[in-house]
Amino acid sequence: MPNEFSDETTRLIANFLNEIGLEVIAKQIEIETFLPGILIDRGRIFVDESKLKYAGDLLHEAGHLAFASPEFRLTLSGEVVFPGVSMEPIEVQAIAWSYAAALYLGIDPKIVFHDGGYRGASQGLLFSLSCGVYFGLTGLRQAGMTVFGDDAVNSGIQPYPHMIKWLCD
């Protein structure tokens, strides 16, 4: 359970993910994983805190799971891949999702966009996002997760990075 995490940020993220419907479970992981200390198995996120390098990686991986339907999410294990779909847009959407989640939780986005991630592009991504240069929003809007631009003005709903919902239906 999330309260089994000793790190405050990991606990905060795990609680949030469990609250929105993504199951996070503290568990010792004996196998090598795509990201140290994180194992996706049938849509659940197992976390070995002793091996976890960056708590923010939980939000990014959750961002991938968030775009799967509940039924499809249960089939996802290991490195999250959507068969027959280019992963580039899903990656960009997960970046946008995890940035919004970090702001919602009140944690420094540098926790998600750390120097060890995004193939060396973390600082550039974070700079763009902090300047309001958002990407991945079309997918978030199509999934009903957020609004932006004229849609936000016309609907009276706060625009991204505010999220209407966190998971695809």
Question: Model-derived features: where do they sit?
Answer:
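Post-HEXXH active-site segment of zinc metalloproteases
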Residues: T33-F34, F67-S98, Y118-G120
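Short helix/loop segments within enzyme catalytic domains
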Residues: A101-G117
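Active-site recognition of the HExxH zinc-binding catalytic motif
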Residues: G56-S69
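Short pre-active-site segment immediately N-terminal to the catalytic Zn-binding motif
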Residues: E4, R42-D57
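Pan-zinc metallopeptidase signature
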Residues: A121-D169
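Catalytic zinc-binding patch centered on the HExxH motif and its immediate surroundings
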Residues: E19, E23-R42, R119-Q123
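Hydrophobic (often cysteine-bearing) scaffold residues that line and stabilize catalytic clefts
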Residues: T9, A55, I90
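A metal-dependent hydrolase signature that marks the N-terminal structural subdomain at the beginning
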Residues: M1-V24, W166
